[in-house]
Regions:
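Short low-complexity, flexible loop/linker segments enriched in glycine and/or proline
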Residues: 12, 80-87
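Short active-site oxyanion
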Residues: 42-43, 67, 98-100
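Thiol/selenol-based redox catalytic cores and closely related redox-interacting motifs
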Residues: 84-165
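N-terminal secretory signal peptides
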Residues: 1-12, 21-27
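Thiol-based oxidoreductase modules, predominantly thioredoxin-like and allied folds used
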Residues: 68-79, 88, 96
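C-terminal segment of N-terminal export signals and the immediately downstream linker at the start
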Residues: 32-48, 78
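Iron-sulfur (Fe-S) cluster-binding segments and ferredoxin-like electron-carrier domains
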Residues: 60-66
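Conserved redox-active cysteine motifs that mediate thiol-disulfide chemistry
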Residues: 48-56
Length: 165
């Protein structure tokens, strides 16, 4: 005959559930918020550990309402995994809203991308490191172009920046 005994692990299960709930609430309530009260969009930024301009770009993104999780990584495998063609690569790769952002793309272009959600593209890129792109900020200003790219490496012009933002 089996005696009625408390279920083993009940205390642990309740404790785990409570801690999970408290952790989730803290994470949600602790996130930076936009003026409308919505949580700031979060981006994952992969960067080479030795690159300083990448942090300047992260500062640009966070100053424009984004939350950034920065991961120092070997960039070759990251670019392969996210299908960034060699000709379109830059110093860091960012993931946000299902898109890949390659390099020093202005926050305003990312905002537009997330609003429009165009079909058939993987993301935006500024190949190389244009001197006047956010995070580089070399004076005098030098115009630069932001491109979309798809899985086959085809590009289209997304934005032309002819003056400082």
């Amino acid at each position: 005959m089996v005696q009625n005994q408390p279920l083993m692990g009940t205390h642990v299960d309740r404790r785990h559930a409570l801690l999970t709930l408290v952790g989730a609430a803290t994470a949600v309530l602790g996130l930076p918020r936009r003026a409308n009260g919505q949580p700031a969009p979060t981006m994952i930024v992969y960067k080479d550990p030795s690159c300083g301009c990448c942090q300047e770009w992260v500062n640009h993104a966070t100053a424009n309402g984004y939350r950034a999780m920065v991961i120092k990584a070997d960039m070759g495998p990251i670019k392969v995994k996210h299908q960034v063609p060699a000709s379109l690569q830059s110093c860091h790769t960012t993931l946000i809203g299902g898109f890949v952002i390659e390099g020093h793309v202005p926050a305003s272009d990312i905002k537009r991308l997330l609003k429009e959600k165009p079909k058939g593209i993987l993301g935006l890129t500024i190949p190389g490191m244009p001197a006047s792109a956010p995070g580089m900020d070399v004076k005098p200003f030098q115009p630069f172009t932001v491109l979309t790219f798809n899985a086959t490496g085809q590009t289209t012009v997304y934005a032309k920046h002819t003056k400082p933002a």
